[in-house]
């Protein structure tokens, strides 16, 4: 019994991706500029993690219906309300924004009264904290450092595995993906919170994985085809890995679509941003990180890459 791999494309596909190199560069630069301008004008919709707010810790006499509670509290008109279990399923953390410390007590009493009148649970309020914007600034700095260190680690890895200009190609693609992801967040008013920082790091990982697969095939083809120039090698390598790329993006998008549809409001920002990032990362690995090698690589420099 033979098992045949699933193929969405014929074995011998020969699409000239490199012919669209200038078009893709121009398109990416325009999108990046639009993202920068949009972010500069409209900023981000910072969530409680970064903007500050109120945290109420409460214990209930039974496990609460979180989706129903989120829906009811969303009607209060006080902005984003985040409900999460911690410890046991009866322990609940309620977080919501507060424009100032003056209306702190007003919003707390509003939440307590709303919960008491809409749910049959017994509420034991254990702690109420006010999280100021200073904490949010520290979290933003920590998130930025996490992305910076991930960029540096990826650069070192690609440099060791391939060569420095391969790392530079991936770095340019990653910066492109992050800029587009941040622009998308600003345009769609997704909550900018800790989960979206995790989403950006997920996008970085996905984009690197896609690019490394193509780079690996480029290195193999440099060994096999000594008479082809670098443009032909890159085109061949992208075409040979295209079926794998399409299958990967379809399966990951379908899995992420399930999170968007059924994951609930708590992970909505994460799942929507990752969905967009998968598309952006696939585009950049094919039309940016691979074609950009033609600016640095030619036959006389390929010996180091082939030997690794």
Swiss-Prot record:
This is Protein translocase subunit SecF. It is found in: Cell inner membrane. Keywords: Cell inner membrane, Cell membrane, Membrane, Protein transport, Translocation, Transmembrane, Transmembrane helix, Transport. The chain crosses the membrane at residues 28-48, 140-160, 164-184, 194-214, 246-266, 272-292. It comes from the Bacteria. It is a multi-pass membrane protein. Belongs to the SecD/SecF family. SecF subfamily. Forms a complex with SecD. Part of the essential Sec protein translocation apparatus which comprises SecA, SecYEG and auxiliary proteins SecDF-YajC and YidC. GO terms for cellular component: plasma membrane. One of its GO terms (biological process) is protein transport by the Sec complex. GO terms for molecular function: protein-transporting ATPase activity. It holds the Pfam family Sec_GG. The keyword Transmembrane applies. Part of the Sec protein translocase complex. Interacts with the SecYEG preprotein conducting channel. SecDF uses the proton motive force (PMF) to complete protein translocation after the ATP-dependent function of SecA.
